[in-house]
Amino acid sequence: MAKNLWAYRGCLLGMAVGDAMGYTVDSKSMDQIRENYGPNGLLGYDLMNGFAEITSYTQLAAFTANGLLLGITRGQMQGHMAPLIRYVEHAQREWAVSQRPWGRPGITHCWLLQEKEMCRRRCMDTWMLDTLSRTPLGTLEEGVNNYMTPASITAAVGVALFYDRENMDLREICRLGAESVALTHGSPYAFLPGALLTDIILRCLIKSMVSLEKRIEDALAAFASQFGREFAQADKVISLVRQAMTLARREDLDPVDAMETLRCENGAEVLAGAVYACLTCDGDFDSAMITAVNHSGRSSAVGSIAGAILGAILGAKALPEFYLECLEPSMLLIELADDLVQGCPMEMGSKLFDDDWDRKYLHGGK
């Protein structure tokens, strides 16, 4: 099945829009948001220097995808490669370097490190930088800590966009989504939502008449089958997402009240909040963004995930132009999305040579 270019672009751009919009009000109370922006809350970007600024949520997803493309390129061009999680780990460590004013190594491998728009110091949880400077990082079996914040959940978006249906196993890629979060977050309430989000994004990338609610139900069933016995916390993750789906069916409920009920603080709650925002918007991206960021929780995280899900369904062409025209890294994200759709065009022994791909994924953009 051919990949839908506009869905891939929409996923990355939508994620960045939600990230940038939520950044302004992240972790502020709803009372503070209303005090600053009026009774209806934040209704669009609060621009800084004319640009909508992204944070580590978009950066981490992009670097994760960069690392995976680096890995598959080495595999095809050199005939051998490490497990995929090693490339995610390497990319996340390089991203962490970009967030510090010191210590950048002379040799780097992610081409995004050469792009200043993707390296601005906007890490939403700075303790991650300390975690990423240590060895070893976490696994599903041995957590590096017990953190459950949503700081690295968007790594799962990069994993989902990397998936190749013809050559990869769905369960393995969902597990990779969890593993990518577990590198820095040891709580199952952080990394299990990474697996579920990976599956939801994958289902949304497929052009289909199936409703979003049905896609989420199918993802929940697959998630329960894969992780339900291994992790007792899987039931709680499922329960939170189902609570969001139940709240979405209530037409008498104010969206702010629903989001406050869901709290939107840890990884599982943030995913639930994003699901609620997407299910109640009736396909209106602007409406979903307003719901996703106006609450007392992690607005940038919820906005990022809601934007990724809805952007994958609607496609880049359906995203409002006023969101994209001042979005700082939009052209870079389009370039990365196109690379994810294309995949490595070269193989070992082939006469085909792509200079741009070689520069980005074998020589770190240099």
Say what each PLM segment does.
Residues M1-K366:
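Structured, active/binding-site neighborhoods that engage oxygen-rich ligands
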